[in-house]
């Protein structure tokens, strides 16, 4: 797409996919887009105003992405760094033109490192030099810099120039004027040479040689002398000078730098993001015809205007505050691990993002330490409640002046652009941190011994009555206070940081915050929604609240159709003249706030939300334009951006001056500029000669310590001595150099190559800290290495909190400079502090120990953080005093709990496996009533990552598997519904009303059929609710997933899932299972006695039998559900038989044979004939169930038209009656399966692996699995607070059956580092009692042995601890309650003793597990629990012997790895069951062998994209299942005919089909084994 819009004859905007360039008739410049992480995605690009000006006219545009150096002396955290050698230039008429590095000189770190060469030929010595001096008015009037390119040869020069030859016009004594271009514009230097009337513009670009030929004919010029210069970016603060020692040969110099000194460009520029092409074209098309170019801010990046603001009073205020924050964070980094100060530390390491993270840090501290962020309970705020609650301190005044409110609006909204909704929370902090914002300056601000007093117009900062600093008041009349421990930061017109101990906490004295926008930022909408606070400017509080739940917030706005956003009640005294104007400001910034939240949402949520927000925002912007004060250009510009963004069609308001945020952020003035340290990444070279540093790029003046050197590379004498780190840190007095150059035997320590050693090193771990050792005798330009013993670090005891005069401390291989007042001495830490030595140039490094207990700060009254998103309560973290909980990046799946030390990190394998398995298990939840506000969640990634982009990549493979699983699951549900509907259709056809005599029994059966029809409809509706929006299934799962971070277990369900009266629970609570209507209520098995009236209905059509065939085919869809259908049909006559009479099918065949003696030969002949027919039919059906139905039709057509058909009707009636019962059983099985899933989830939450999650036969087959568990170090499991904990499974070494009880032996070959030998021996285990009538109906365990339970193995006693009591048995096979022994347990940690006692009897619900991995089955509890024990070495004495106690430090593995190949077969005879009538089941076992590729485990398979393909490949083998079905079906059909022929003459007779069903079971762990069971058995008894 290529578009061109010309809004004026002299301005064309070219738009294509690569960007856009503003082309004027003056020049062409392309700017670099700034990589800014927190910028708005819609307003991401920036542009600059394009001015029409004459050549030589002066522009006032500022750069949008860099920081200026506007003074010759920089303030570095309280001390000053001076620059020397000022350089200026003048006009040809001699008038001073400007001084270098004014407002147009910026410094920034570049993403890339530029390398450029300066080439000198014979007779030339090119010298690039950039110097700095004091600038008038902070350098705001300077326009250009000067780069002098001197000849420095023997050529004659103009008398007006300096020695050597200056390039340029002779009247320009200081050479040519230049500027450095941007990195994306071929970084280089553009310079102009004055030619008498105009300037000739040249450009020198990196990697390109240029020949600059000087004009000839004038005395003093460098006549026709070629000069080759190759240059790019400059190093910080100084373009280093290079020279050749000899002028008789050519030489070149290489400079590498990642810094750019940027000067003023002559023309403005714009780059458009590609994703904004269409929108921009649409918007600009509406402005054609506007003559003035006032739209340059359409796509203004927020970072642009924030970094450029200098008129708004608060910005200069926050700049020194950020510096003070950084100072504190460096000093107290060890103490503030839970606070946001480390963010400030990081931001100072990268100058490019300074405003972002400083304001980010400020708001994080401000809104998470002092104030309580309240979220509405039940979607409403209580009386006298706001989103932002103040501390329990008395504040005065609640009014605000009109004008100040307008200013505060503007100031507040700018910070919002950088406020990120992630926040860090500390309760009481490390030592009680506090932030205070005082808007109205008062005579005294007191906090214990700390005071700020107004004295003669200045602010005197006192501690214990002693003035520590004097600050000038800020123009905004705002003072910012920050306290961390006993360090105070105060920011007004300038800033300072002092140390003032705090012993008691008092209230603020006369602290008036009445005009602070921090606290007056909420407005309430009029209309029906009276109690919902509408955030207008509460950027911190409302931002935290609205970002995660913005959809919920928008629904509140939409509740009232008559809601008028223009009717805000601002809660301030509004004058009549300013009411509408104030209203306009409020609405503009409210719309701006919502727009920022909107643009920060992920795309999927943004699309959904946009339609809801658009009318509301347009309503906000519906006031008259005249209501906006045209002089307030900041609000006008925001208003224009909003109407462009949200589709307003009328023109923007035109204003007559630049908005505030188009000016530089840090303007001139001593102490306002920034200074940044950089860590140098060095390259290493191997030299076998004397070791040394190569040339330093520049020089290091040890007398003044002005500049940070830039090392090109570092060398060590031997290959094994490579200095991997070199760091240079500046303090006010010296440079501290840290070198890491360590070998296995000795270290090299740095000095100089000459005998005069000015630096010596201290060995501290793997680093060497170099500090001045003696006074330098010269200015050195290089360092060298030579072997020298390191100085010892003495340990010094001190009682001082602060060591005055010391310069900094070393911790974790990093040097941190201290405040000028001195270095703090922390308690319980090593304090390696550098202090002045015996002489002025000598410094020492010592380890200081505090010998007195530090002052304990009285903590501020705790303000708890209640994170209550509606209908979800996140309350698992208990915040206590002196503890800190850091919730870091919850959206990304990382939870760090400092209380327990547990970590849930998404990068490990344990995360992946538990992630997948846990979601698989809980993917069949009950129907949930979900809040309507969550109905728009449509993506798996949306739920898991919640907008976190980094998480999306990590969770992609998981969501792919989940999406496929959901497709299969939903398809299976649909197939089940279809099958049930078809069965009902068959019932209607085969049981017509005309064939039944409507007795009470038949009416009851008829009602059963109709009820079955209703049941199908209800089941279908229930499944449709489960399937229809995919979000419901997702949300049901994500409910558990969210709680995995919070440690909240799901509550137990109340009531039975099949009870006639469903349990009542709040449908609005995510935590409660919603009330469900049972699919079949009060189901009674109908009698199968049919009083058949002998009539001659029509023969069932082929379509009917086809429907039956489709029912049979639905078994495959049931397979994916993992259902087991047990059909038990009961006949009235059968009840009268004894169990022995119907125990075995062979007995019935014997009975049948007695009836068929005289007709046996005829039956046999008929069976042979039918058998051949069935065989032919089986061969011709060709795996098609439709052909099977045709076969049924062929057999039916052979029926006799009279008595045979009457019998068939009877049999069909009986068969269909059986189907009714079977479908009732099916519905119960569906619920039973759901209960099993739910119970399994509950068990997992309780740390229990119950039979609902794994069956005994699976344990048997885990032998191959467990063989791959390698022994080694103990591996931890997830924290107690995680919702899902997965224990490793044992090695099953043997299995046997003893007295109808299944026994398993197992061992766990784990060798721990703290235990000698293998932990566990082979122990027998008791799994389940097959004779218990409810052995398949496990419930949630009522008692669970806690995870800290140890286990004892005595000679013949097997013991486990429960509630401080050890329960022991004499033998693992003797679990009778009378055989229990009880040992009392002592709480003593050392030499704990256990004593056996014969009483009391134990709780029957306690299982014996832990280290021996027992499973105790209790009739009272109906549970079987498996757990894995521990391996910490503790002992106990019993009968003069010492036995080990296993403590819960090692609980096995987090995952199970299965090596290839693997084949798991299944035999379900081990499944215990006691149905009302015994079943004799026949099985058709189909086992698939799955071979995994080498080096691939199940974890990789489950989370791999190819997992789908593997499942599809397995599905191809289902053809074999169809063949099995055909064989069984043909056999059943043949037997059906055999029985019908045999029953000729035996009317009436009653046929009961005992079993007709598909029994399908899918092994959850492997996910690929499908076992199909199909059987049809018949019983007959003569009437």
UniProtKB/Swiss-Prot annotation:
Positions in the Virion surface compartment: 21-1553
Record's keyword terms, sorted: Fusion of virus membrane with host membrane, Glycoprotein, Host-virus interaction, Membrane, Signal, Transmembrane, Transmembrane helix, Viral attachment to host cell, Viral envelope protein, Viral penetration into host cytoplasm, Virion, Virulence, Virus entry into host cell
TM region positions: 1554-1574
Topological domain spans for side Intravirion: 1575-1583
Tagged with keyword Signal: yes
Membrane topology: Single-pass type I membrane protein
Signal peptide boundaries: 1-20
Cellular location(s): Virion membrane
Function, as annotated: Mediates the binding of virions to the host cell receptor and is involved in membrane fusion.
Family statement: Belongs to the torovirinae spike protein family.
Subunit relationships: Homotrimer.
Name this protein carries in UniProt: Spike glycoprotein
Organism name: Breda virus 1
Gene designation per UniProt: S
């Amino acid at each position: 797409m290529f578009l061109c819009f010309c809004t004026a004859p002299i301005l064309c905007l070219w738009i294509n996919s690569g960007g856009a360039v503003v082309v004027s008739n003056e020049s062409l410049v392309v700017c670099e887009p700034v990589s800014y992480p927190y910028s708005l995605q819609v307003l991401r690009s920036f542009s600059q105003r394009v001015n029409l000006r004459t050549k030589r006219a002066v522009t006032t545009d500022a750069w949008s992405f860099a920081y200026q150096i506007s003074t010759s002396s920089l303030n570095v955290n309280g001390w000053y760094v001076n620059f020397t050698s000022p350089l200026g230039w003048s006009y040809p008429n001699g008038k001073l033109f400007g001084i270098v590095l004014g407002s147009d000189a910026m410094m920034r770190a570049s993403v890339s490192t530029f390398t450029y060469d300066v080439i000198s030929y014979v007779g030339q010595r090119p010298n690039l030099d950039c110097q700095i001096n004091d600038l008038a008015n902070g350098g705001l009037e300077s326009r250009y810099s000067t780069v002098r390119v001197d000849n420095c040869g023997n050529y004659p020069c103009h008398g007006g120039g300096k020695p050597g030859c200056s390039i340029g016009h002779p009247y320009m004594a200081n050479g040519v004027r230049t500027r450095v271009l941007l990195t994306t514009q071929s970084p280089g230097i553009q310079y102009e040479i004055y030619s008498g009337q105009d300037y000739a513009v040249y450009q020198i670009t990196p990697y390109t040689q240029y020949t600059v030929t000087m004009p000839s004919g004038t005395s003093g010029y460098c006549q026709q002398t070629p000069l080759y210069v190759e240059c790019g970016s400059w190093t910080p603060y100084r373009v280093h000078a290079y020279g050749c020692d000899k002028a008789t040969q050519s030489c070149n110099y290489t400079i590498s730098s990642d810094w750019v000194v940027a000067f003023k460009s002559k023309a403005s520029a714009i780059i458009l993001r590609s994703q904004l092409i269409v929108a921009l074209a649409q918007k600009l098309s509406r402005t054609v015809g506007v003559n003035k170019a006032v739209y340059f801010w359409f796509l203004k990046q927020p970072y642009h205007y924030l970094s450029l603001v200098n008129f708004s009073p608060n910005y200069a205020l926050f700049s020194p505050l950020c510096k003070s924050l950084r100072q504190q964070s460096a000093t107290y980094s060890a103490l503030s691990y839970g606070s946001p100060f480390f963010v400030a530390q990081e931001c100072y390491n990268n100058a490019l993002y300074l405003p972002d993270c400083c304001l980010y840090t400020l708001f994080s501290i401000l809104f998470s330490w002092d104030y309580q962020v309240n979220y509405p309970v039940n979607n409403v705020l209580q009386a006298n409640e706001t989103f932002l609650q103040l501390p329990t301190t008395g504040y005065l005044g609640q009014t605000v002046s009109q004008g100040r409110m307008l200013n505060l609006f503007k100031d507040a909204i700018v910070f919002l652009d950088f406020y990120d909704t992630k926040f860090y929370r500390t309760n009481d902090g490390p030592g009680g941190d506090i932030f205070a914002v005082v808007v109205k300056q008062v005579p005294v601000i007191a906090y214990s011994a700390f005071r700020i007093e107004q004295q003669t117009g200045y602010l005197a900062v006192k501690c214990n009555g002693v003035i520590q600093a004097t600050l000038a008041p800020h123009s905004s009349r705002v003072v910012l206070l920050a306290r961390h421990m006993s360090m105070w930061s105060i920011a007004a017109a300038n800033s300072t940081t002092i140390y003032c101990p705090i012993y008691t906490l008092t209230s603020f004295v006369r602290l008036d915050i009445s005009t602070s926008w921090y606290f007056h930022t909420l407005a309430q909408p009029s209309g029906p929604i009276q109690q919902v606070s509408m955030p207008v400017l509460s950027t911190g509080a409302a931002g935290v609240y609205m970002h995660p739940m913005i959809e919920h917030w928008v629904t509140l706005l939409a509740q009232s159709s008559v809601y008028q956003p223009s009717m805000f009640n601002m809660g301030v005294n509004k004058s009549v003249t300013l009411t509408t104007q104030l209203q306009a400001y409020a609405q503009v910034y409210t719309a701006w706030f919502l727009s920022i939240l909107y643009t920060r949402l992920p795309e999927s949520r943004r699309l959904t939300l946009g339609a809801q927000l658009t009318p509301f925002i347009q309503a906000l912007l519906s006031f008259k334009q005249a209501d906006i004060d045209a002089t307030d250009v900041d609000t006008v510009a925001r208003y224009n951006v909003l109407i462009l963004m949200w589709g307003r069609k009328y023109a923007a308001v035109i204003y007559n001056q630049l908005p505030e945020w188009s000016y530089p952020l840090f303007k001139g003035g001593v102490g306002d500029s920034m200074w940044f340290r950089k860590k140098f990444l060095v390259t290493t070279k191997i030299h076998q000669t004397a070791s040394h540093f190569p040339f330093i790029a520049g020089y290091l003046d040890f007398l003044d310590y002005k500049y940070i050197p830039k090392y090109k590379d570092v060398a060590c004498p031997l290959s094994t001595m490579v200095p991997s780190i070199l760091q240079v840190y500046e303090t006010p007095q010296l440079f501290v150099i840290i070198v890491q150059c360590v070998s296995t035997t000795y270290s090299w320590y740095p000095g100089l190559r000459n005998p005069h050693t000015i630096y010596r090193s201290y060995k501290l771990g793997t680093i060497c800290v170099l500090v001045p050792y003696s006074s330098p005798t010269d200015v050195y330009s290089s360092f060298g290495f030579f072997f020298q013993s390191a100085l010892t670090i003495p340990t010094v005891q001190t009682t001082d909190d602060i060591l005055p005069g010391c310069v900094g401390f070393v911790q974790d291989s990093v040097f941190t400079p201290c405040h000028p007042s001195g270095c703090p001495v922390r308690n319980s830490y090593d304090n390696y502090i550098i202090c002045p030595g015996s002489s002025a140039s000598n410094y020492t490094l010592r380890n200081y120990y505090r010998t007195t207990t530090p002052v304990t700060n009285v903590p501020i009254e705790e303000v708890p953080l209640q994170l209550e998103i509606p209908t979800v309560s996140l309350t698992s973290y208990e915040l206590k005093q002196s503890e800190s909980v850091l919730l870091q990046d919850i959206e990304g799946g990382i939870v760090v709990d400092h209380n327990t030390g547990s970590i849930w990190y998404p990068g490990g394998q344990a995360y992946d496996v538990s992630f997948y398995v846990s979601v698989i298990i809980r993917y069949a939840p009950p129907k949930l009533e979900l809040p309507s506000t969550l109905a728009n969640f449509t993506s798996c990634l949306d739920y898991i990552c919640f907008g976190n982009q980094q998480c999306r990549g990590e969770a992609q493979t998981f969501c792919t598997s989940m999406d496929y699983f959901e497709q299969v699951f939903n398809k299976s549900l649909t197939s089940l519904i279809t099958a049930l509907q078809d069965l009902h259709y068959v019932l209607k056809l085969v049981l017509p009303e005309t064939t039944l005599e409507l007795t009470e029994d038949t009416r009851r059966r008829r009602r059963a059929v109709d009820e079955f029809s209703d049941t199908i409809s209800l089941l279908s509706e229930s499944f449709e609710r489960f399937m229809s929006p995919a979000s419901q299934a997702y949300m049901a799962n994500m409910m558990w997933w969210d709680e995995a971070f919070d440690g909240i277990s799901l509550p137990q369900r109340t009531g039975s899932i099949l009870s006639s009266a469903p349990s009542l629970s709040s449908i609005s609570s995510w935590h409660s299972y919603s009330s469900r209507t049972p699919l079949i209520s009060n189901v009674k098995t109908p009698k199968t006695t049919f009083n058949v009236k002998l009539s001659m209905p029509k023969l069932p059509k082929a379509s009917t039998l086809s429907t039956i065939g489709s029912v049979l085919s639905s078994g495959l869809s049931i397979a994916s559900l993992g259902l087991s259908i047990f059909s038990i049909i009961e006949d009235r006559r059968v009840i009268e038989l004894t169990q022995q009479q119907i125990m075995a099918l062979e007995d019935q065949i014997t009975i049948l044979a007695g009836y068929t003696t005289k007709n046996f030969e005829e039956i046999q002949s008929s069976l042979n004939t039918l058998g051949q027919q069935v065989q032919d039919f089986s061969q011709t059906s060709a795996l098609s169930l439709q052909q099977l139905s045709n076969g049924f039709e062929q057999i039916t057509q052979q029926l006799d038209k009279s008595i045979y058909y009457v019998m068939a009707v009877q049999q069909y009636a009986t068969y269909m009656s059986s189907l009714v019962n079977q479908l009732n059983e099916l519905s119960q099985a569906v619920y039973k399966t759901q209960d099993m899933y739910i119970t399994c989830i509950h068990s997992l939450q309780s740390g229990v692996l119950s039979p609902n999650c794994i069956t005994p036969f699976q344990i048997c087959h885990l032998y191959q699995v467990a063989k791959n568990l390698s022994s080694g170090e103990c591996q931890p499991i997830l924290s107690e607070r995680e919702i899902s904990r997965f224990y490793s499974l044992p090695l099953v070494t043997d299995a046997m059956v003893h007295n109808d009880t299944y026994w398993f032996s197992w061992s766990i070959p784990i060798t721990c580092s703290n235990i000698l030998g293998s932990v566990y021996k082979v122990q027998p285990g008791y799994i389940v009692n097959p004779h218990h009538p409810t052995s398949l109906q496990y419930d949630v365990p009522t008692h669970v042995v806690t995870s800290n339970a140890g286990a004892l193995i005595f000679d013949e006693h097997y013991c486990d601890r429960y509630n401080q009591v050890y329960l022991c048995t004499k033998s693992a096979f003797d679990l009778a309650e009378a055989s229990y022994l009880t040992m009392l347990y002592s709480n003593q940690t050392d030499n704990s003793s256990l004593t056996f006692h014969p009483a009391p009897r134990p709780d029957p619900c306690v299982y014996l597990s832990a280290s021996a991995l027992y499973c105790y089955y209790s009739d009272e509890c109906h549970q079987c629990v498996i757990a894995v024990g521990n391996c910490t070495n503790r002992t106990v004495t019993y009968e003069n012997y010492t036995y080990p106690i296993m403590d819960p430090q090692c609980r096995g593995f987090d995952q199970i790895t299965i090596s290839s190949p693997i084949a798991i077969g299944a035999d379900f005879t081990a499944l215990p069951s006691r149905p009302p009538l015994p079943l004799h089941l026949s099985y058709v076992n189909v086992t698939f062998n799955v071979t995994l590729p080498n080096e691939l485990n199940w974890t990789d398979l489950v989370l791999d994209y190819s997992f789908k393909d593997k499942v599809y490949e397995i599905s191809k083998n289902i053809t074999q299942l169809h063949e099995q079905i055909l064989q069984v079906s043909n056999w059943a059909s043949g037997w059906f005919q055999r029985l019908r022929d045999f029953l000729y003459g035996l009317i009436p007779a009653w046929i009961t089909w005992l079993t007709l069903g598909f029994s399908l079971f899918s092994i959850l762990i492997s996910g690929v084994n499908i076992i199909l069971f199909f059987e049809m058995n018949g019983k007959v008894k003569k009437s």
